């Protein structure tokens, strides 16, 4: 079966040529798919024989809403989707004054092993396809009735560990014949795969790269983020500098504030030294509690921010959304998995 929704327009045109159909059919089907149509029968400008041919040869699967949580505080919606193979992923819709942002997953599970993240518990199961990533945006938009203006790849999984798929997804959502979401409205988060950061820089995409840093020194970062053991903080910051030089895009550094682990003044001072001379922004994140983790939220967020700012570093505190639901990454999926195995 052909995964037609993962195709770009050029590939789709070639596919229709193989079927003996005119190339313009590809654009018609592409536009239907990117409007959120999940049945060839709904594509009313196609002939019935062609619709039947496509239905017999192509995968077109709508993800099922396993659970939906809506925050009474701010309207944030957390979705748990059931995929066609039975696996589950999460998507979060966040409402801001500037528009609606959807946070999507790039993998089923994650193999990065970060100590403070629920999505890595149980490891990585598999990569998502471009279609499965796109469906999160389309279905969230359809279900909520909220048009999506911004996308963040900060859900379950390490996007750069699924590099080619993520690039294709970015191409699809950026297409003028699809959702046409501009690259400057897309953020991609990585825990710091330096070779992939360099590879991404070569494409010179105008998206925002968000580096999940969480500690400025190797001892601390290696303890809470195993990926650092093979990379190191110096190599990571060097890759970030190269990325900025190639793309001209300022990097956002994500920093989850953990009590007694990464919130000391000396760590703020060290972080500031790393960032001197390279435009960047530090996003301080109040830690979400994970039941299986002993790590606790820091009470020094404001002090840490002030310390960074005293060095001339731009630092903000992430607004916490969905505080009354399982809105942080991997929590809802983890709870569902535990329930299914009891």
Give short role names for the model-derived ranges.
Residues 95-132:
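Canonical Radical SAM [4Fe-4S] cluster-binding loop centered on the CxxxCxxC motif
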Residues 121-150:
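Conserved alpha-helical substructure of the radical SAM core
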Residues 141-150, 155-311, 315:
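Conserved AdoMet/S-adenosylmethionine-binding subsite of the radical SAM
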Residues 28, 107, 133-136, 305:
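Glutamine-centric residue-chemistry signal
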Residues 85-99:
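P-loop NTP-binding catalytic core
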Residues 35-36, 119-124, 217-218, 287-291:
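A short, flexible beta-alpha/helix-coil linker loop
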Residues 77, 89, 100-104, 112, ...:
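Generic beta-strand structural signal
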Residues 1-89, 241-250, 255-342:
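Auxiliary Fe-S-binding modules of radical SAM enzymes
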């Amino acid at each position: 079966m052909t995964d037609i929704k993962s195709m770009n327009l050029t590939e789709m045109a070639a596919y229709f040529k193989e079927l003996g159909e005119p190339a313009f059919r590809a654009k018609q089907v592409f536009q239907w798919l990117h409007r959120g149509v999940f049945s060839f029968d709904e594509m009313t400008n196609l002939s019935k024989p062609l619709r039947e041919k496509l239905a017999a040869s192509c995968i077109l699967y709508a993800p099922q809403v396993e659970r939906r949580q809506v925050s009474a505080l701010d309207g944030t919606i957390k979705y748990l989707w059931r995929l066609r193979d039975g696996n589950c992923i999460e998507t979060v819709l966040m409402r801001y004054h500037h528009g609606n942002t959807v946070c999507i997953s790039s993998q089923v599970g994650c193999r990065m092993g970060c100590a403070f993240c629920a999505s890595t518990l149980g490891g990585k199961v598999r990569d998502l396809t471009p279609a499965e990533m796109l469906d999160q945006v389309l279905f969230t938009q359809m279900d909520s009735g909220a048009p999506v203006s911004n996308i963040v790849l900060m859900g379950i999984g390490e996007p750069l560990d699924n590099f080619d798929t993520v690039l294709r997804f970015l191409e699809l959502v950026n297409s003028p014949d699809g959702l046409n979401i501009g690259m400057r409205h897309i953020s991609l988060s990585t825990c710091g795969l330096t070779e992939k950061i360099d590879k991404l820089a070569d494409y010179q995409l105008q998206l925002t790269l968000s580096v999940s840093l969480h500690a400025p020194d190797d001892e601390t970062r290696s303890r809470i983020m195993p990926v650092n053991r093979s990379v190191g903080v110096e190599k990571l910051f060097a890759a970030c500098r190269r990325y900025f030089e190639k793309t001209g895009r300022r990097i956002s550094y994500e920093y989850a504030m953990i009590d007694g682990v990464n919130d000391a003044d000396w760590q703020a001072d060290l972080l500031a030294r790393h960032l001197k001379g390279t435009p960047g922004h530090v996003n301080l994140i109040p830690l979400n509690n994970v039941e299986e983790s002993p790590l606790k939220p820091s009470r020094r967020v404001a002090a840490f921010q002030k310390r960074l700012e005293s060095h001339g570093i731009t630092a903000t505190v992430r607004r916490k959304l969905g505080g009354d639901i399982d809105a942080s990454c991997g929590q809802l999926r983890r709870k569902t998995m535990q329930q299914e195995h009891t």
